Regions:
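Conserved hydrophobic/aromatic packing and binding residues within compact polymer-binding modules
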Residues: 17, 31-32, 47-50, 76
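Helix-turn-helix DNA-binding elements, focusing on the entry/boundary residues of the two helices
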Residues: 17, 28, 44, 59-62
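Recognition helix of helix-turn-helix/homeodomain-like DNA-binding domains
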Residues: 37-56
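DNA major-groove recognition helix of helix-turn-helix/homeodomain DNA-binding modules
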Residues: 54, 58-75
Length: 78
């Protein structure tokens, strides 16, 4: 059976988080700050690791990221 998490690709949304963040001309720090305003604490370094797919994303983080980036959760998975 194939492993879902192999140490390299630890999430499925990283490339789209980067895509939508850049479309909104938002820095990683601004995304981090916006998440914090929602009570979700993801430092700038963690945003970088999410985008590089080297960090997992919790369900709460997923909902908050989608809200801040103004996209549906489904769009993050495309």
């Amino acid at each position: 059976m194939a492993r879902i998490i192999d140490g390299k690709d630890m999430n499925l949304i990283g490339k789209n988080v980067r895509k939508y963040r850049k479309l909104r001309k938002m820095s990683q720090q601004k995304l981090s700050d916006s998440l914090e305003l929602l009570g979700v604490y993801v430092c700038r370094g963690s945003v970088s690791r999410i985008e590089d797919k080297s960090r997992t994303v919790t369900d709460i983080e997923l909902f908050a990221i989608a809200k801040v980036l103004e996209v549906s959760i489904e769009e993050l998975f495309k």
